[in-house]
Amino acid sequence: MGEHLWMCVGLRSDYAVQQRDGRYLRAFRPLSSALLSAHLAGRLTIGTYVITAEGTCSFAVFDADRSDGLAVLLDVQQLLAEQGYPAYLEQSRRGGHLWLFFAQPTPAEQIRRWLGPIASARALELYPRQAGGKGIGSLIRMPFGKHRRSGQRYPFLDRELRPVAPTVAEQVAWLAQVERIVPPDLPQVSIPAHRSSSTQWVAHGRSIREWNAQQDPFALI
């Protein structure tokens, strides 16, 4: 089942492990399918470095760590859908993530040239956070892993902010259905206007705890 998670991996030659305080410790060794399975089982939580050694990315993520984060990301999701680019919403501890998956490795500089203005207009973080260059770059927690500080897992959500599948195992299988896109190679991108959105995530903490309580950890081993 962990094989589906490879599409959420950036750099394969290294990774990081989340500690109890939420920070990450670099592993300095390659990632493996066994480690991805351990991530799903909750034995450890993996952070993946978004940019590869070649300066490319297989995905991009908008990060909104704030109370209205899911509503803002839904707006971005709709904007991208209108342009023909599907994106996938994931809840996080303090807001949400919006993932785009690419059909082929794409230069980080190209991704930031395309999506950077959208992120800046809404005060969102964008991964990749760098346009390439030296260094290992920034990392992001891989989906479905147990956040070591909150003790919770966070699901992918549909437009109504409901989990796309009732169990983690089914959510992982759902990943095989997501559409991979070819990003545009644009010299510059105009910044879209803000939209108002009334979508709210009600009872965030309680809903996540209830969803986690329904999971069978042995089904992920």
Residue map of PLM features:
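DNA replication initiation on ssDNA origins
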Residues: 1-59, 67-74, 136-139, 144-153, ...
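Catalytic micro-motifs at enzyme active sites that drive phosphoryl/nucleotidyl and oxygen chemistry
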Residues: 47-51, 77-78, 83-91, 124-132
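Histidine-centered divalent-metal-coordination microenvironment in nucleic-acid enzymes
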Residues: 61, 77, 86-113, 133-145
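Helical (often loop-to-helix) elements that flank the catalytic cores of nucleotide-handling enzymes
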Residues: 72-82, 101-126, 148-170
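Solvent-exposed, flexible loop/coil residues
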Residues: 130, 144, 160
